[in-house]
């Protein structure tokens, strides 16, 4: 069975709405079913699936999922937002910028874009609307800024990329810091332009910030400090050599539980089981996709698909700039129609040999790949962030996407800079 037939069948399965994990399992088994002499028999595929999820680094994923849900229920995003509003709320575009900075910080806790949108958006979008910002703008800015959750470390997609390629999770986390901050700064620049052009209700904003400032900075800082230092604790443990990324993920769970239960008292003991069930429901589909993607990628390797694709592309595109642009366009399209996890696990083994052949650093490519797929979070038809944000405000998905287009433009500008200036990603390594 040819590789082309495998991918066509996979596309058909997706079009007729067969779940991604089942689709991957089907196409992983078929080559061996059609050719009994092929190494990848059904038993091989099953062993590959079990082997794919039997990974210590992979344990970080459910832990970060659980930590993110604990922090969402624990109102930690509210504490982060309050301190940023206190500091910059009265400035032009101060409130939207506070939303973006909150997404940056929350992304450094949860490692997930949809979780960032849900946690930050549920609290900030109603406030933005109350302060006079249009509902579609408020929804769009949270949906796009939520994409920073997969770029700023710790990042679940970076863990997936490390699993698929064997690269260092810690190095990938470091490489995501400057790109995440740069994209956040570009989004704030757009928010400033938007607010200068369309105006703000300064009277409402000043009243709201004044109410907050009446508490006093020390009181606000006292309430927020536990939320502010959480990324420092998680990332500090990793880079100080105290803990591996997986161990740091476990630390983040216990830290979130401790702060929410005993400091902020925003969750009760009897709610913990429900939170764990929610985390399991969130992670279970990811686990099945991980297992099936691993088996499928190993079958593709046995079929020599990475080598064949690499040889064909390098034979037809000798110019490095053109090649990188084509890969970026391809990844952008993939991000629009496929979830991040299977995209990373399937495409990384295929594309990495190609970019390495032109001298591109694997860590640098990992950042470029994740930024491409982060844009997919806010582009139809899949656009998970769009659907999460839409569920918070009832604004139609396409309206949010239309309002998000200028911000996506800044995301694309950042992508070009990251692609052709490797030092942005590799500076901290």
Language-model features and meaning:
Residues 1-429:
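Alpha-helical transmembrane segments of multi-pass membrane transport proteins
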């Amino acid at each position: 069975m040819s590789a082309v037939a495998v991918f066509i069948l996979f596309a058909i399965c997706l079009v007729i709405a067969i779940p991604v994990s089942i689709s991957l399992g089907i196409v992983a088994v078929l080559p061996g079913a059609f050719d009994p002499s092929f190494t990848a028999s059904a038993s091989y595929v099953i062993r590959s699936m079990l082997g794919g999820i039997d990974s210590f680094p992979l344990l970080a994923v459910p832990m970060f999922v659980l930590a993110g849900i604990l922090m969402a229920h624990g109102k930690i995003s509210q504490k982060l937002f309050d301190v940023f509003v206190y500091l910059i709320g009265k400035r032009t575009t101060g409130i939207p910028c506070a939303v973006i900075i909150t997404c940056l910080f929350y992304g450094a806790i949860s490692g997930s874009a949809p979780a960032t949108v849900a946690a930050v958006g549920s609290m900030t979008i109603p406030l933005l609307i109350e302060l006079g910002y249009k509902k579609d703008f408020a929804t769009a800015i949270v949906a796009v800024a939520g994409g920073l959750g997969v770029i700023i470390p710790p990042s679940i997609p970076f863990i997936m990329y490390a699993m698929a390629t064997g690269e260092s999770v810690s190095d990938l986390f470091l490489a995501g810091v400057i790109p995440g901050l740069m994209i956040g700064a570009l989004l704030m620049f757009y928010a400033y332009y938007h607010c200068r052009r369309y105006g703000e209700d300064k009277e409402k904003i000043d009243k709201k910030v004044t109410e907050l400032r009446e508490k006093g900075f020390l009181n606000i800082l006292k309430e927020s400090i536990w939320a502010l230092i959480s990324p420092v604790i998680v990332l500090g443990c990793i880079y100080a050599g105290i803990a591996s990324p997986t161990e740091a993920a476990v630390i983040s769970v216990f830290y979130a539980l401790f702060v929410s239960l005993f400091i902020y008292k925003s969750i009760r003991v009897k709610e913990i089981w429900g939170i764990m069930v929610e985390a399991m429901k969130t992670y279970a589909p990811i686990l099945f996709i991980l297992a099936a993607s691993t088996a499928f990628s190993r079958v593709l390797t046995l079929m020599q698909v990475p080598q064949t694709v690499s040889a064909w592309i390098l034979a037809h595109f000798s110019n490095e700039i053109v090649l990188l642009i084509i890969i970026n366009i391809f990844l952008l399209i993939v991000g629009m129609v496929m979830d991040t996890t299977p995209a990373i696990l399937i495409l990384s083994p295929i594309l990495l040999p190609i970019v390495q052949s032109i001298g591109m650093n694997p860590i640098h490519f990992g950042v470029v790949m994740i930024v491409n797929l982060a844009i997919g979070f806010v582009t139809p038809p899949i656009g998970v962030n769009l659907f999460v944000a839409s569920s918070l405000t009832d604004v139609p998905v396409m309206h949010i996407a239309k309002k998000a287009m200028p911000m996506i433009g800044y995301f694309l500008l950042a992508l070009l800079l990251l692609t052709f200036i490797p030092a942005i990603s590799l500076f901290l390594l």
